[in-house]
Amino acid sequence: MKIGIINTKIRTVFSAFACMIAASLVCTMPARAVVEININKGVIEPLPIAITDFLSADQLGPNITSVIAADLERSGLFAPIDKGAFIEKISNPDAAPRFEDWKVINAQALVTGRITKQPDGRLKAEFRLWDTFGGQQMIGQQFFTTPDNWRRVAHIIADAIYERLTGEKGYFDTRVVFVDESGPAQKRVKRLAIMDQDGANVRYISDGRAISLTPRFSPNRQEVTYMSFEGGSPKVYLLQLETGQRELVGNFPGMTIAPRFSPDGQKVVMSLLQDDGSANIYTMDLRNRSTTRLTNSQAIDTSASYSPDGSQIVFSSDRGGRPQLYVMGADGSNPRRISAGDGSYSTPVWSPRGDLIAFTKQSQGQFSIGVMKTDGSGERLLTSGFHNEGPTWAPNGRVLMFFRKAAGAGGPKLFTIDLTGRNERQIQTPNFASDPAWSPLLE
């Protein structure tokens, strides 16, 4: 079946040429810049950064600048300086700025750039990142794209700045698939939607005629697996984002719950409801549609998530009386409980870095989003409230997105929070939204 609502093709339309540094700007200072952010410190003071409006013949330059600034500010690691404080007006982004003018306003880093339209209709976006106190250029790049992809250029530039100043990959050039919820609570329409990580460019990828739940990206970013109640019973589908084509992953006799891809994209792990009311974890090989049962209990085993190397699986099970977190080998061997605190644990998901597991915890009437080490130690709750659920990791493993429903609220909303628990932000969506899943970095 083809869903003809919208084309969600993910295109690689950029070419980058790094380090386009003019000979006159090459300096003899050490390659390691003075300005940097130690992202591994417990408490981080945001870095003051000046982001000048990119020069352009129209509003496109300032628009791109605004997206870059918003990305960096939302990370909690950067504090963009108000443009009203700028002393120097940049007229030539290729020339070295007057560093003293930027040091006066405590801009520890400076971004300049330019947008020009090419004869073939494409846009050329150039930017430079400067260390103002070190008096040197840190990075210079240019990108070519089509005019309708200007926001993506902004995200890519923000990622480049983030990586140069923190030493780690950014997460701004990514997408999020989620469940869009509209209509009254008694007749809620739940359809799949996809958007940029900042909430822009929302597009619907299912028509809402049947409830759709638990969307998850494939590692190649081109496919989404999800559960649909089309026909009255829950089934798992695989949707091709580029073409809108979808296929039934498996038509199992019982309910199919929480499908998720393996890191290599060749398998889907999911829970199947048994006749006795229990649920066990299975994998399906997408190449030949063969299934393998991994757990065999009288409990509810669900919400399986692979480790980044594919060697282990974390899941939730009430085999001990209430839902707790367990880790087992990818073949189902050696299951062991890792959660030890009071309350119930659910929706575990392994960090892309491999060092942490995020989860939902219910305790004393509160739903919390937390993280723990993969052996269960070091549990930390990042945010708590009436109802918080469904964490998903940014591809760099530094930020989580989840959904929250406040007491008395009409429906859930999406939020992000970093690992310090101090930087929580709402992501604006057209309607209520739940069950987000973050994509890997786009290419």
UniProtKB/Swiss-Prot annotation:
InterPro entries: 6-blade_b-propeller_TolB-like, PD40, Tol-Pal_TolB, TolB_N. The keyword Nuclease does not apply. It is found in: Periplasm. Gene3D superfamilies: TolB, C-terminal domain, TolB, N-terminal domain. Its main location: periplasm. Residues 1-33 form the signal peptide. GO terms for biological process: cell division; protein import. One of its GO terms (cellular component) is periplasmic space. Pfam families: PD40, TolB_N. Keywords: Cell cycle, Cell division, Periplasm, Signal. Part of the Tol-Pal system, which plays a role in outer membrane invagination during cell division and is important for maintaining outer membrane integrity. HAMAP family: TolB. The Tol-Pal system is composed of five core proteins: the inner membrane proteins TolA, TolQ and TolR, the periplasmic protein TolB and the outer membrane protein Pal. They form a network linking the inner and outer membranes and the peptidoglycan layer. Belongs to the TolB family. This is Tol-Pal system protein TolB.
